[in-house]
Amino acid sequence: MKHLGTILFAIIFLSIARSNAADLQVKMLDNSKEGTMAFEPGFIKAGVGDTIIFTPGNKGHNSASMLVPTGAKQWKGEFDKEIRVKLEKEGVYLFACDAHKVMGMVGVIQAGKAVNLAEAKKKVEEENAKIFLNKDRFSKALAQVTKP
């Protein structure tokens, strides 16, 4: 009987934990309030367990990870297709559109604490040298990350 109570508690706890996870949408656009070739929003503060849904607002875009926390899964979406990315590890995730990265079509996700912020800052600095349009977009998005 004691074990049954423990099992029931675990089931209820897991159900509550799952119900707290959110689906957050990011649009892939030619033009947005952020300017040309942009993800909207370009910065997302999420929780571990949340799912980011990248949806095409215009043709010719995808979402691909550039940096993920240790142990997290990389992703590479197909062009013109929705992709769902579940945030299973705490930290900073950097992403871009493969076709428009040099135009500053980049973004940042913070899931929980920014445990890999130093690594993310270094990667953004490296990538900024390759961007010729919307040069400050990556740095502005990363500046919204709250320190661990």
Predicted feature locations:
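Positively charged n-region of N-terminal signal peptides that target proteins for export
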Residues: 1-5
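Extracytoplasmic copper-binding redox domains, predominantly the cupredoxin/blue-copper superfamily
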Residues: 20-148
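Bacterial N-terminal signal peptides
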Residues: 6-15
